[in-house]
Structure formats: structure tokens, C-alpha cells
From Swiss-Prot:
The lineage of its organism: Bacteria, Bacillati, Cyanobacteriota, Cyanophyceae, Synechococcales. This is Bicarbonate transport ATP-binding protein CmpD. Keywords: ATP-binding, Cell inner membrane, Cell membrane, Ion transport, Membrane, Nucleotide-binding, Translocase, Transport. It is an enzyme of class 7 (translocase). Belongs to the ABC transporter superfamily. Nitrate/nitrite/cyanate uptake transporter (NitT) (TC 3.A.1.16) family. Induction: By carbon dioxide-limited conditions, probably via CmpR. The complex is composed of two ATP-binding proteins (CmpC and CmpD), a transmembrane protein (CmpB) and a solute-binding protein (CmpA). GO terms for cellular component: plasma membrane. It is a peripheral membrane protein. Part of the ABC transporter complex CmpABCD involved in bicarbonate transport. Responsible for energy coupling to the transport system. It comes from Synechocystis sp. (strain ATCC 27184 / PCC 6803 / Kazusa). Pfam families: ABC_tran (PF00005).
Amino acid sequence: MQTLKSQRAMPTATPSDQKTTAFLTIENVSKVYPTAKGPYTVLENVNLTVNEGEFICVIGHSGCGKSTLLNMVSGFASPTDGSVQVGGKIITEPGPDRMVVFQNYALLPWLTALENVYIAVDAVHSQKTEAEKRAIAKDHLAMVGLTDSMDKKPGQISGGMKQRVSIARALAIRPEVLILDEPFGALDAITKEELQEELLQIWNDHRCTVLMITHDIDEALFLADRLVMMTNGPHANIGEIMTIPFSRPRDRDRIMEDPTYYQLRNYALDFLYNRFAHDDVA
């Protein structure tokens, strides 16, 4: 596996700004599904080490096993071979130390925004009083700018607001790993950029480890510390890992004026559309 470290026009964050402890470890992971035509290997011998507090984006064409990889980190699926560990413990099932935000929001439509967050807090922190749990839910809705909408149900708010509720719900239980499965893929460009900015601010405050799937190279370059680029499936693997050098806190306008941004962007585009072109992608 090769690592791209391009010329750095902007300084990286200083060591005091970042945690450097290996925290999430994906070791020799393969995933094979039985089919009528025989075993189908989605992922083969995947290795990745993520530092505590690091923000990782994963990109690749449909069928490269991105969601399968996240499902194994989430505990929704198990590797056929290899192991996935968080904090030195092998993942065997879902747990409150790992929370997932999906593209489709996954909110309960008969509950208000506050109740959707409260129910997660109640499940994990049942020992707390009702007042304490409601305060946690309200604080996290306020964090994503939904104080005035917490009594509305999902059908009464926009897609961007629904995703804010999903993010608030995930973070309200203080997970060690936040797993994002294309959380902004269904949103319009303006709302998408707004939520990207909010996500970075929240991540900066919480400093949990983030593993995020995206199909958007620009999104990855703005958000991530490193970009994991997957080869095509079957037998998909990590093709390269790109280190993203822009300092934090990040300024979108400043980044997009930097020549390094376009070098990294063009390299990722070449990886996806030339070296690992996919017929299903326009």
C-alpha cells in the first residue's frame, strides 16, 4: 500500500492539537459472502490503523466494500478473516462506544426531535434522572442549532434538519467512534456545506474518532485528516491513503485557493477515474 504525501503549502496541525494514539485497528480483514455461484469476496486483506481523535474519510466506487467495512466497525457484521478492534478490544457486536449516522436519517417519525435524541440517551444512560437525560438531549440539539425545532417531528422539518437531529442523537451518548455513512449525500449543495462546517466544529469540541464514507472528494479534502481510497471489488482493498495537510481549524475559502488542494483533488480523481475506473460511475 502506498501513501501519498504531497507538497505542503499549509502547515499541519501541531502535535499538541492532535492525539496520536492508535485506537481503531482493522487488521488483515476479509469479508466473504456465500452465493449460489460460490464464495464472493467483497474485501480482502484490509489493514488500517486510525489514531484516537482522527478524522478519516473512505472513498471508492460502488461495490468496493465501503459500507461492508463500516458495518464491521459498527458491529453489524463480522469479518470472515482478521479482526477489528477499538481501544484494544475486538468488536463482536454493536455498542454505545460506536454510533452511526446514516444517509437516510433513521429517525422515528412519531417522535419529536427531542424525543428522538432522548430515547438514545435513555438507552445508554438509564441511571441518570429524567431531567439529566433531557438536558443532555437539549444541549446536543442546541449544538446543531435546533433549539427552536426540538418539539417538531421529522415530517415537519427539512432534510438538513433531520440530519442535524441524527448527528445530535449520535453524539449525545458521547461515543468514542462516530461512523458516518454518506450523511450528506441526499442534501443540496448549500445545506451540505453548512453541515460540513457544523460537523467540523462539533468534532473539534468532542474530539471523537470519525470514520466517514463519502463519494465527494471535495468533502473529504475539507473534512478529513486522511483519505482512504479503495480499489474496486470484488477482492477490494485499500489502494492508497492520502494525507491531507491543511491546518485546523479549516477555512474553506483559504483551502480552495491553495494549489495543494488541486494537486490532491486531481490525484484522487485520477485514482478513481483512470487507475480504478468503474463502468457504473459517470
